[in-house]
Amino acid sequence: MGLGKSVVIEKQRMNGDLRMVKKRKQHRAMASRHIVLLSCFVFLAAQHGIQAVEYEVTNNAGSSAGGVRFTNEIGIPYSRQTLVSATDFIWGVFQQNTPEERKTVQKVSLIIENMDGVAYASNNEIHVNANYIGSYSGDVKSEFTGVLYHEMTHIWQWNGNGQTPGGLIEGIADYVRLKANYAPSHWVQPGQGNRWDQGYDVTARFLDYCNSLRNGFVAELNKKMRSGYSADFFVELLGKTVDQLWTDYKAKYGN
């Protein structure tokens, strides 16, 4: 082999070695960046109390009028995003900033199907009546969104280990819907209703009044209901019995 040829081969070998060294440095730099990013994610997760929840949406209504309208005017992607948004909003209303303050829920399923009623939540599943979607006159997407906020509240709220009155449970769910600005026009106006625990929109309006007396009242009430329920919670938080508060509420609005 000639001297010139040997020099060329040696230069090629050296250039190859240099390229390998450069690639190793690049890989080390990328690995370092990944470690930094992972560390940042872990830090942020610890700071903000990230809780991983899986959301699943299924349309079992097929080619029925409600199933078709759901597909055309609402859709699975929007429904899934609404479940996520509703969860974040509910945690905010309940002032639950860490996973320790919340229910442990790994998966929430939304099922669109033909059934009776409007919707219900059970065992971390939300069932919505496709017939209701199909026959609703008006902005069905807004109505559907409000229903999801109500039902998602049932997934996340505390119920006093089954001791909380049903009217209060439903009232808190509608209170969340009210604060999310998805209250429909047919709801009662403030001050209307016969009993504080009448439920739904009546109790939601009353809770809104109570929350105006003490900002964060509903969040504190929900926290107290983690392990049980007592009507004394109203006295502890607002200094009056719930019946006194109801009387004051009715008087404020001339009812």
Where are these regions (language model features)?
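N-terminal low-structure segments adjacent to metalloprotease catalytic domains
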Residues: 2-72, 255
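Pan-zinc metallopeptidase signature
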Residues: 31-37, 43-58, 197-204, 209-255
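Auxiliary, metal-adjacent structural segments of Zn-dependent hydrolase domains
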Residues: 53, 61-131
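Second-shell loop/turn segments in exported
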Residues: 69-80, 131-143, 158-164, 192-195
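Stable alpha-helical elements in mature extracytoplasmic
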Residues: 79-86, 90, 140, 144, ...
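Post-HExxH zinc-binding segment in Zn-dependent metallohydrolases
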Residues: 86, 97, 162-205
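Sec-exported extracytoplasmic/periplasmic mature domains
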Residues: 91-99, 153-162, 174-182, 208-215, ...
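Active-site scaffold of zinc-dependent metalloenzymes
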Residues: 109-159
